[in-house]
């Protein structure tokens, strides 16, 4: 299978748009990279992250709120209730929430798109 960059390269404007997203959101921006990486691991159904996503001994409140939102975006939007939004607003600014939400949605979409192209390890709902 061709690399994801090779696939995007078939349409240079798409490759350029992805490069900008990578620089400004996926690998840059105002949200701590460690939080984004943790959310990406959750989306990839990393058992270590999923099994302990609400464990205060493993993750601080900011991380747990981000993981709860990741779950809501990816698998159960009903979890994005007033309580979750209150938790998110304690830990993140509005601009950070915009960036983190975009990161979660973009990463989830990329994982599913690449899986349809035959990439190994297609994500699914946490067990």
For each feature predicted by the language model, list its residue ranges.
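Hydrophobic alpha-helical segments
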Residues: 1-127
């Amino acid at each position: 299978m061709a690399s994801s960059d090779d696939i995007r390269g078939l349409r240079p404007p798409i490759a350029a748009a992805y490069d900008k997203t990578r620089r400004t959101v996926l690998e840059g921006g105002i949200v701590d990279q460690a939080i984004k990486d943790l959310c990406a691991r959750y989306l990839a159904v990393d058992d270590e992250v999923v099994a302990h996503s609400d464990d205060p001994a493993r993750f601080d409140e900011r991380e747990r709120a981000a993981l709860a939102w990741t779950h809501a975006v990816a698998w159960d939007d009903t979890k994005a209730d007033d309580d979750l939004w209150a938790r998110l607003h304690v830990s993140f600014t509005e601009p950070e929430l915009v960036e983190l939400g975009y990161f979660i949605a973009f990463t989830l979409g990329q994982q599913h798109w690449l899986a349809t192209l035959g990439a190994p390890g297609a994500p699914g709902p946490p067990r």
